[in-house]
Structure formats: C-alpha cells, structure tokens
Amino acid sequence: MLAVVFTLLLLGACEKVNRLAQAPTIYVEKGSYPESEVPEYLRTVSPDILFVTDRRAVTTREGKMNFSHERSPAMAFGRIEVNLAPGWSWSDLLQEQSANRNRMPAIVTGDAETLVQFSPTPLPFELKNGVARPLPSALAPYQEQKRAFQRRVSAELKRANRRDVVIFIHGFNNGFDDGVTTLANIWHSTGRIGVPIVYSWPADSSGLFGYFTDRESGEFSIFHLKEFLRALSSVTELERIHLIAHSRGTDVATSALRELVIAERAAGRDPRRSLKLDTLILAAPDLDFGVVRQRLIAEQFGPAFGQIIVYMNSKDGALGLSQTLMAGLRFGRISSENLGESERVIFKRIQNVNFIEVEQVRGQSGHAYFRENPAVLSDIALALRTGALPGSSERPLTRIDGNFWQLRKDYPLQVQ
C-alpha cells in the first residue's frame, strides 16, 4: 500500500505545471524564433487553443466556464484563450525565446467557449436483420454536429501557415487547463505550425485511488477519441495529423488509434492515407512493454504513421513506481540494455519507430521533461517542422544502437 501511495503522489506531483516553458535550445543558440512563418493573427501572447473533450462542463467558483474531471457522454468542441505571459507583449515573448533568460510566468486561461455540443453517445439505435443502426432522428443531428466541427477546423486550416493539426492528449491527474497550457507551450515552441487541438479526457480524479479512476476514465474516452479523429481526418483541407501523447494519455491514444487502424485495413484502405497520420509522439509512455509488443508491434501498428517517436528516461521515477505497482516494465523506461537479442531484432525491423533516451533529467522533471526540457522541445519542434528522422542533419541525435538514440542536454548544439 505504501508503494501505491508514493506512486500516486509522485505521478500527481509531476503533472501540475502551468508556466511558460523555457525557450527551446534551437532558438536560443541556433537562430531566432521563426516569427516570419507565424501568421499575423497568431502574433499574440494570447492565442486561442481549440479543444475536444468529454469532461462535464462546470462553472468555477470564480465564475469561469471550464470542465471538470467528471465524465460526460457527449463531446464538446470549442476554443479557449491562453495567455502565455500576462503583461508581456508579443515582442517581449520573442525576445524571451531568443535570450534564454529563463523567466517562466504563470499561464492564464480564459473561459472555455463551446462551439459545438455533440449529442450524447451511444446514439439510440434499432436492430434490423441483426444489425444495429442508429435511429435516423438521432443520427441526423449528430452528423450535422460533425459537419459544424469540420467547417470550423476547415476555416482555421485555411488561414494557418500549414494545413496540419497538432493534437495533444494529456496524462493522469491532468485537469482541463493542464492539457490546454501544455499544448500551448509545445505548439508555441514549434513556431505555431498548423492548428492546435487538445483532446481532454476526464482525468484529474482526487483521492488515493485517483490513478485507477483515471485509468478507467481513459477507457471510457476511447470511443469519443475515435469519433474525433474520424471526423477530423475527413476535413478536406487537412493534410497531416501530428499527435503527441503523454504518460497515461499514450494508452488512450494508442488504444483508439489501434482500433482505427484495424478498421481502415479491414475496409481495404491504407490508414496512413485515409486517417492522414503523420507523426505520433509518445512521451514518457505509461504502457506495459509486454502489451506494446503483443498489441502494437505484432499487429504492425507502426506503418500507419509517417514516424513514431518515443521519448524515454530510464530514471523516470514516476514510471518506476508505476512499474512496481503494475508489475510490468513500462515502455517509457526501457533502454537498449533492457532488450534481449530477439527484441533488438524486432525493433531494428521497425524502420519508422525511434526511441530517444533523454539525458540528465531526474526528480520532478524526470516525468514531465517533454514539456519543460529545452532540448526535448527543440527535437519536437524539428520533427514536426521538418519531418526529419533522427541522425539526419536536421535532427543530429547521437545513435546508441539500432533505432535507439540519445538526446543530450545541449542538443542540437554539440554532438559527439
């Protein structure tokens, strides 16, 4: 029981950071922030972040519209203003990104505005010849809600600098604002490419067993995530989806994606083309390594993406305790030394999947490094901006063995 307590406390403690991230190394040392590529309407310290959530809507004590940890049977799509640095101007923010003064003000979010409220699922249905079909009276408004969502995303893509969508799926013990502010940091670090959308599942349960409640809520959310991704991939203007998932969010993401990939292949379609999947980033994945081998690797999950990037830290204390609790090696803690010869052969065959060991991160930052570490933020930015693979001139990571790489503290400045 003591191990359970420590696990939950540490995992929770690593999730509550809502500050402007330290400037990525690439902008401080290798060149200025790419302002010229940022559309005029996005040159602000208070951009809008889009969201899709199946949390229950609430009004906070301060009168703010937000979403709780409770589950909702209906998805909501909307927007929320995120002030990355209250009191700063756009010029102040740019100077900070290039000067590395390490000032990290608290991020402030506004009211969450719902633009499309979806019908609750499952939709009412009837059986005909043994086949369940939604009632037309229920299906018609649901389809119109999807079209309204698609129209808004289409409009955003038409004025963006790229026809890409960057999705973030948070982990355990994250409130709605936690996911929103994390995506705002990552998206800003990339040079604000494409359209940012946070998928916020009903995590952030309190109490000793909140971790387990959140795990179940992740299972609850998988159908809604699939519906969101199906609707999104059908937007004509969309060219590429980049999906970033963290910790327990990697289970929610890969479970939904796995089912979508299976369905697309069964229908005779190439999921990479039909779902427009480009980059999948799994940061500190809280996944059982054995389950990954049998459900993802054995089912050829990888070819559905342009590339898959797994950020790992063998000293990730939160995943270490989760590993003790769940009695299975966590995917976010593996290293090349953990693998037997047969496993090395398997990973070498997976050409578009790369495992990146993040150097010199411990303690609280040992689990949240993907959103706090300037070197990791630099690599995410380079991967999404260029599509380059590790070891290329654009992403000069240090090879450890096969498709295992090391990301040094000063990356991408000095490579040995």
Name every feature range the model reports, one short phrase each:
Residues 1-2:
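Bacterial N-terminal signal peptides that target proteins for export
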Residues 10-13:
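C-terminal motif of bacterial Sec signal peptides marking the signal peptidase cleavage site
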Residues 19-133, 139, 158-159, 180-184, ...:
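Lipolytic serine-hydrolase domain surface
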Residues 140-153:
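Alpha-helix-centered segments that form part of catalytic cores
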Residues 150, 158-164:
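Proline/glycine-enriched tight loop/beta-turn segments at coil->beta junctions
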Residues 167-171, 246:
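The conserved beta1-alpha1 loop
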Residues 174-179:
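Short substrate-entry loop that stabilizes the transition state in hydrolases
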Residues 225, 245, 249, 253:
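Gly/Ala-rich beta-loop-alpha elbow adjacent to hydrolase catalytic centers
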